[in-house]
């Protein structure tokens, strides 16, 4: 028996149909358990060509906005300030950014976390070069006061456009389950060398 087929909730039933249609049950469970999931391109219903177009659009936008040249995304060296400067508001740069933002699989997971009234509030790139210093642990849920409740107020939905397999690739550090704390990172938890999260 599928609950969604019985009109149980007018707001949840369509979302459950999307979760079923796109085969996202595993990813929903990972979001609930760990606070993160990695959805492969085939599940996102995109191919390597789409990912390449998205990556190239990011690189061209960075070049135009910052007056730099990125000849090869795997070997070019960029100063940190050039890689991250002017990185916001990408939708008007290239249609591929709109396609990535409204990808139905992506939206199904965002709506799972935030509800049907989720609002798209920002888009940016993150370009990491070799030797860039690490960021401290932090929360991207800016402006949410302590005691904001055990609900998701915000989420990040990122497209990975290059290899992201180990520390050499400059990965994002994530604390599994930290979303259950319902608070931002505390000062004594921020430093990667001394954080109690291991």
Regions found by a protein language model. Give the residues of each.
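Active-site glycine-rich loop that binds ribose-phosphate moieties when present
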Residues: 136-145, 159, 181, 187-192
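Short, conserved beta-strand element in jelly-roll/cupin
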Residues: 146-167, 180
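Conserved hydrophobic/aromatic beta-strand scaffold that supports enzyme active sites
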Residues: 36-38, 136, 156-160, 196
């Amino acid at each position: 028996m599928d609950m969604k087929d019985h009109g149980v909730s007018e707001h949840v039933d369509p979302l459950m149909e999307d979760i079923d249609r796109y085969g996202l049950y595993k990813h929903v469970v990972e979001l609930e358990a760990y606070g993160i999931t990695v959805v492969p391109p085939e599940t996102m219903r995109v191919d390597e060509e789409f990912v390449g177009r998205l990556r190239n659009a990011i690189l061209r936008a960075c070049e135009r906005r910052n007056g730099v040249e990125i000849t090869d995304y795997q070997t070019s060296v960029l100063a940190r300030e050039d890689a991250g400067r002017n990185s916001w508001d990408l939708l008007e740069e290239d249609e591929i950014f709109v396609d990535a933002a409204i990808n139905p699989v992506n939206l199904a997971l965002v709506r799972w976390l935030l509800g049907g009234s989720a609002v798209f509030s920002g888009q940016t790139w993150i370009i990491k070069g070799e030797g860039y210093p690490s960021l401290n642990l932090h929360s991207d849920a800016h402006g949410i006061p302590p005691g904001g409740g055990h609900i998701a107020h915000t989420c990040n939905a990122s497209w990975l456009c290059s290899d992201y397999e180990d520390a050499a690739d400059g990965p994002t550090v994530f604390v599994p389950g930290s979303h259950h704390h319902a608070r931002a990172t505390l000062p004594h938890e921020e430093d990667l060398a001394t954080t109690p999260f291991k």
